[in-house]
């Protein structure tokens, strides 16, 4: 961690003293962190993320990392001259593409994220949702209105899945050994088929199954914004549902807040959508009064 980020030695000491009550509050707790977006592609932010996760472990918190990798998948598909096809804004994942998705997510990206944490002094182990039967998946069901017939029809997205069941035993085995699990969101179906799973959905489901104290969702926006584009610091699940209904929450933020609501309804104490572009975003959220993102409670 670059001490220049925190000013003088006196300022660093003041920051640590201020953080102590929050460290005590979360000691022994499980925190699931969804990592992706711009923070993953920026070298300096990536190093800071690794340091943040290592520090969480050092002060007695049990971090569990779930990562995305959309840009890296896109890059590999281009290199292999595999054309992406989208239906209603969702990528269709055929048999050839799901092999690439698994190779990139469970291989290149997974080991890169684990490496960031290991270089910061902690011990991280990269796995995917297929390992130990962690993420049991089912085919994602989506429908859309046909523009010609105006009839609702099922969309065939190929091997795009969603979590059906989370078996947390492999996570407990790793955390019990003092290791930090780094999880690629690739799941296994009942038929043995590999499924590509949205990282937000995987993180929310894993946090719920673990009964995590916090779910941190790193994004490329400050959090949930109101109609004046100002950050909403805290929302209840009911507030979120009302915000979707009245149009305050729109677009790509809807599935993110829905994952958070689902997680808190499954027992997570709080889910936070925060800006991963902010240096040391995880530490600022966990160890400062009020945090920096939008906290969603049940």
From Swiss-Prot:
GO terms for molecular function: acetylglutamate kinase activity; ATP binding. GO terms for cellular component: cytoplasm. It comes from the Bacteria. One of its GO terms (biological process) is L-arginine biosynthetic process. It is an enzyme of class 2 (transferase). It catalyses: N-acetyl-L-glutamate + ATP = N-acetyl-L-glutamyl 5-phosphate + ADP. Pfam families: AA_kinase. The keyword ATP-binding applies. Substrate binds at residues 69-70, 91, 196. It is found in: Cytoplasm. The keyword Heme does not apply. Pathway: Amino-acid biosynthesis; L-arginine biosynthesis; N(2)-acetyl-L-ornithine from L-glutamate: step 2/4. Keywords: Amino-acid biosynthesis, Arginine biosynthesis, ATP-binding, Cytoplasm, Kinase, Nucleotide-binding, Transferase. InterPro entries: AceGlu_kinase-like_sf, AcgluKinase_fam, ArgB, Asp/Glu/Uridylate_kinase, Glu/AcGlu_kinase, NAGK-C. The record marks 34, 256 as: Transition state stabilizer. Its EC number is 2.7.2.8. Belongs to the acetylglutamate kinase family. ArgB subfamily. Catalyzes the ATP-dependent phosphorylation of N-acetyl-L-glutamate. This is Acetylglutamate kinase. It comes from Granulibacter bethesdensis (strain ATCC BAA-1260 / CGDNIH1).
């Amino acid at each position: 961690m670059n001490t220049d980020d925190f000013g003088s030695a006196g300022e660093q000491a003041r920051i640590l003293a201020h953080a102590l009550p929050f460290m005590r509050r979360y000691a022994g707790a499980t925190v699931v962190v969804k990592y992706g977006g711009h923070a993953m592609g920026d070298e300096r932010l990536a190093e800071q993320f690794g340091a943040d996760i290592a520090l969480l472990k050092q002060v007695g918190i049990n971090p569990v990392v779930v990562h995305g990798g959309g840009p890296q998948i896109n890059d590999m598909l281009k290199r292999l001259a595999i054309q992406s096809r989208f239906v209603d804004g969702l990528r269709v994942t055929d048999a050839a593409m799901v092999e690439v998705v698994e190779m990139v997510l469970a291989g290149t990206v997974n080991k890169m994220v684990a490496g960031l944490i290991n270089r910061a002094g902690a011990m991280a182990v990269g796995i995917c949702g297929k390992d130990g039967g962690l993420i049991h998946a089912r085919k994602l069901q989506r429908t859309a209105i046909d523009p010609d017939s105006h009839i609702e029809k099922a969309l065939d997205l190929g091997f795009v899945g969603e979590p059906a069941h989370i078996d947390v035993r492999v996570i407990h085995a790793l955390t019990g050994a003092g290791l930090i699990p780094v999880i690629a969101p690739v799941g296994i179906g009942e038929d043995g088929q590999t499924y590509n799973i949205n990282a937000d959905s995987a993180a929310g489901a894993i946090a719920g199954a673990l009964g995590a104290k916090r779910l941190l969702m790193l994004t490329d926006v400050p959090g949930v914004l109101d109609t004046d584009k100002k950050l909403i610091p805290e929302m209840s699940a009911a507030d979120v549902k009302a915000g979707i209904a009245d149009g305050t929450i729109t677009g790509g933020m809807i599935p993110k807040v829905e994952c958070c609501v689902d997680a808190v309804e499954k027992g997570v104490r709080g889910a936070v959508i925060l800006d991963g572009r902010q240096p040391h975003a995880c530490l600022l959220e966990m160890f400062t009064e009020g945090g920096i993102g939008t906290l969603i409670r049940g």
